[in-house]
A protein has these predicted regions:
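Noncatalytic alpha-helical scaffold of FAD-dependent oxidoreductases
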Residues: 1-275
Length: 275
């Protein structure tokens, strides 16, 4: 009875709850995350220690593999469950956690090959802050700042530029993976190609990702946007198809759907000047 009344009050007065409790807590949480990111990017960053960090992961996995199979616990990363972009919350506290959350550095940018080399826990926000001042962005850049590039590569990611370049994992040039026996392999389309093609959608079940190379694209200072209303599902679908499949397709295609027969389609093109 009391529980039903409590949730009924929360529902009826949700604006007050959100404004009085949700917003302050969200602001504090966001501030803490930003300070944490600033610390990791400006103070704790040590890309030159990548090899040592990978060796540490290999050592931990090798020791796990040496335990008799009947006594082994399931293996997982030490990334906090609450940080996952998932509806599943696994009981990691009962599993064998591999310490690898320090793998969060941007390692290098190869401008000639248009590839950036990163560690798996680099976030979308972090890599964007690194690339934009240099005139580049990831070929597939999500709007979720705290999403990690490793998670997107091993699961799935797409964005408003995907009609040109495909899904996130289709823009991965190489994976560095520690296998269950502790060995380190580099998977590309030419080397360990079976593993390269199996890693997307695997959610970390085939090995621990310790590094990857991602395709980048050059950017311009501005994006010229065009907004087109649609007044039916057919019009909306046809217009989206036309834009995405055109020979001179815009760089970005997105839409906001307001109802069954009302939507606004947004298309954007890189521009050198503000228009």
């Amino acid at each position: 009875m009391f529980k039903d009344l409590f949730f009924d009050l929360l529902t009826k007065h949700r604006t007050l709850v959100l404004a009085g409790i949700g917003l302050p807590i969200g602001t504090i949480f966001d501030t803490v995350l930003r300070l944490r990111n600033l610390y990791y990017e400006r103070i704790a960053s040590a890309p030159q220690e990548h090899a040592q960090r990978v060796a540490s992961v290999q050592d931990q996995v090798t020791r796990w593999a040496s335990v008799p199979e009947a006594e082994r616990k399931p293996m997982c990363t030490d990334r906090k469950t609450w940080m996952n972009l998932s509806t599943r919350f696994e009981p990691k506290h009962t599993w064998h956690r591999i310490k690898m959350s320090g793998l969060r550095d941007v390692l290098s940018l190869d401008i000639e090959q248009q590839v950036v080399h990163v560690e798996p826990f680099v976030t979308v926000g972090q890599i964007t802050r690194y690339l934009l001042p240099r005139g580049y962005m990831l070929a597939v850049t999500l709007e979720i700042e705290e999403a990690t590039v490793g998670g997107l590569a091993m699961a799935v990611g797409m964005t408003t530029h995907s009609h040109k370049v495909g899904l996130f994992q289709e823009n991965v040039k190489a994976y560095e993976v520690v296998l269950a026996d502790g060995s380190l392999v580099r998977a590309t389309t030419e080397e360990h190609s079976d593993l390269f093609h199996a890693l997307p959608w695997s959610h970390g079940t085939l090995g621990l990702l310790v590094g990857l190379s991602l395709r980048v694209i050059p950017v311009k200072p501005y994006v010229h946007m065009t907004y087109s209303p649609a007044y039916s599902q057919q019009e909306y679908c046809e217009r989206i198809r036309e834009l995405a499949c055109a020979a001179d397709a815009p760089d970005f295609v997105e839409a906001t759907v307001y109802s069954k027969d009302r939507a606004v389609i947004m298309s954007g093109r890189f521009a050198d000047v503000e228009t």
